[in-house]
Curated annotation (Swiss-Prot):
The gene is gatA. The active site is at 77 (charge relay system), 152 (charge relay system), 176 (acyl-ester intermediate). It is an enzyme of class 6 (ligase). Allows the formation of correctly charged Gln-tRNA(Gln) through the transamidation of misacylated Glu-tRNA(Gln) in organisms which lack glutaminyl-tRNA synthetase. The reaction takes place in the presence of glutamine and ATP through an activated gamma-phospho-Glu-tRNA(Gln). Heterotrimer of A, B and C subunits. The lineage of its organism: Bacteria, Bacillati, Bacillota, Bacilli, Lactobacillales. It comes from Streptococcus pyogenes serotype M3 (strain ATCC BAA-595 / MGAS315). Keywords: ATP-binding, Ligase, Nucleotide-binding, Protein biosynthesis. One of its GO terms (cellular component) is glutamyl-tRNA(Gln) amidotransferase complex. Signal peptide: none annotated. This is Glutamyl-tRNA(Gln) amidotransferase subunit A. GO terms for biological process: translation. Its EC number is 6.3.5.7. It catalyses: L-glutamyl-tRNA(Gln) + L-glutamine + ATP + H2O = L-glutaminyl-tRNA(Gln) + L-glutamate + ADP + phosphate + H(+). The keyword Ribonucleoprotein does not apply.
Length: 488
């Protein structure tokens, strides 16, 4: 018997009643992972021995009835440090790297007696939108194995969507949680910048990166955010603002809520059927008592260009630490120190990572800094001001998560610009440091469509309130791919 169809609260009740043990739940989860892994390829590492050892220790001391997450398995994206468990960032450069410390988000999960079941596949160093740049494997969409799962947190999304695990963690720099959540029909939240500590996250774009949760439902997503969100002295960008319980508004009605629908989010490049799906969702919110009105975010069209200058520049700096000297891959054909650096980085990084390092180095170089990096920062401020103006009058922003449904494997990975444009609806949220969620909102050609809700900083509980209200009157989150046990 599999337990992957049970909610976290249902699993908790079974554990407290001793109808199952943490060890049995872990064993069943490992079976679910193994039986589906060949089809989807969600994991780089499955930490079977460590997980079973941890489960046995939890059983020995007993399940805490007041701790919802006690004994619950968790999958973790492979750029989030886990002590003693390989953490590769899906790169040859870190193919053998075992951290000697846990990321704060992982430590918080361990503190609640969650069980890290394994590390999920991703685009190399989180650079990509299809989980095709991984050094180890290509993850496949849970609904159609000829399609991409999205990225860069593709493995974390498919692990939940395919029924391998109930909960997972990803990271989001320009849409890397929300886009794969949309492509796989699950709930993915990018929290306000600073809500979840970045300590232990292998850095890509330090002013953009944020760890966040995946789950099948809105409430379970909020329950996982309750675990991992915390202030942290080890992260200088950690925010002091905290919500006591991110589930506190779930179940409340949304009568009187004002929701903005930016015309730019339904314009050029958006699939007409996705546009129809979003407009139908807007009508559903109106039926629930909210007001939905069209607004403008005029500078959002510059988001992709701004993002790839800023993110690549930050990556160029962050990835300087990978040199083959202290840890990770080292080229064995070097005769001197210069050759160690050059050969290791040339052989250890994949093409997309090298492309972004070069772009970032160029943008920061003498004579080009003002024209590119400085100007990108100025336009970023204009994008932030656009959001501020809208949020002066509205509670939330509504729109599609992605311009299309999941595209085919090996269709965009040789066209960087087309791949970059797939993030045009999610990138502005990262540039502004805002919270954003993707929830299931329908299907086009049998593939899931994601609906994005964006709020002002530190309004995750309001986002969850609106998302849960929509979820309560729709059944998209209940529909499952064949690999999970559904009929799609």
């Amino acid at each position: 018997m599999s337990f992957n169809h049970k909610t976290i609260e249902e699993l908790h009740d079974l554990l407290v009643a001793k109808e199952i043990s943490a060890t049995e739940l872990t064993q069943k989860t490992l079976e679910d992972i193994k039986s589906r892994e060949e089809a989807v390829g969600s994991f780089i590492t499955v930490s079977e021995e460590a997980a079973l050892k941890q489960a046995a220790a939890i059983d020995a001391k007993g399940i805490d009835s007041d701790n919802l997450m006690s004994g619950i398995p968790l999958a973790v994206k492979d750029n989030i440090s886990t002590k003693g468990i390989l953490t590769t960032a899906a790169s040859k450069m870190l193919y053998n790297y075992e951290p000697i410390f846990d990321a704060t988000s992982v430590a918080n999960a361990y503190a609640k007696d969650m069980i890290v079941i394994g590390k999920t596949n991703m685009d190399e160093f989180a650079m990509g939108g299809s989980t095709e740049t991984s050094y180890f494997k290509k993850t496949k969409n849970a609904w159609d194995h000829t399609k991409v799962p999205g990225g860069s947190s593709g493995g974390s999304a498919t692990a939940v969507a395919s029924g391998q695990v109930r909960l997972s963690l990803g990271s989001d720099t320009g849409g890397s949680i929300r886009q794969p959540a949309a492509f796989n029909g699950v709930v993915g939240l990018k929290p306000t910048y600073g809500t979840v500590s970045r300590y232990g996250l292998i850095a890509f774009g330090s002013s953009l990166d944020q760890i966040g949760p995946f789950a099948p439902t809105v409430k379970e997503n909020a329950q996982l955010l309750n675990v991992v969100a915390s202030s942290d002295v080890k992260d200088a960008t950690s925010a002091p603002v905290r919500i006591a319980d991110y589930t506190s508004k779930i179940g409340r009605d949304i009568k009187g809520m004002k929701i903005a629908l930016p015309k730019e989010y339904l314009g050029e490049g958006i699939d007409p059927e996705i546009k129809e799906t979003v407009l139908a969702a807007a009508k559903q919110f109106e039926a629930l008592g909210a007001t939905v009105e069209e607004v403008s975010l005029p500078h959002s069209k510059y988001g992709v260009a701004v993002y790839y200058i800023i993110a690549s520049s930050e990556a160029s700096s962050n990835l300087q630490r990978f040199d083959g000297i202290r840890y990770g891959f080292r080229a064995d054909d070097a005769k001197n120190l210069d050759e160690i650096y050059v050969n290791t980085r040339s052989q250890g990084f994949g093409d997309e990572v090298k492309r972004r390092i070069m772009l970032g180095t160029f943008s920061l170089s003498s004579g080009y800094y003002d024209a590119y990096f400085k100007k990108a920062g100025q336009v970023r401020t204009l994008i932030i001001e656009d959001f501020d103006k809208v949020f002066a009058d509205y509670d939330l922003i509504l729109g599609p998560t992605t311009p299309t449904v999941a595209f085919g494997l090996d269709t965009l990975n040789h066209d960087p610009v087309a791949m970059y444009l797939a993030d045009l609806l999610t990138i502005p949220v990262n540039l502004a440091g805002l919270p954003g969620i993707s929830i299931p909102a329908g299907f086009v050609d049998g593939l899931p469509v994601g609906l994005q809700l964006i709020g002002p900083k530190y309004t995750e509980e309001t986002i969850y309130q609106a998302a849960a209200a929509f979820e309560a009157v729709t059944d998209y989150h209940k529909q499952q791919p064949i690999i999970f046990g559904g009929d799609k």
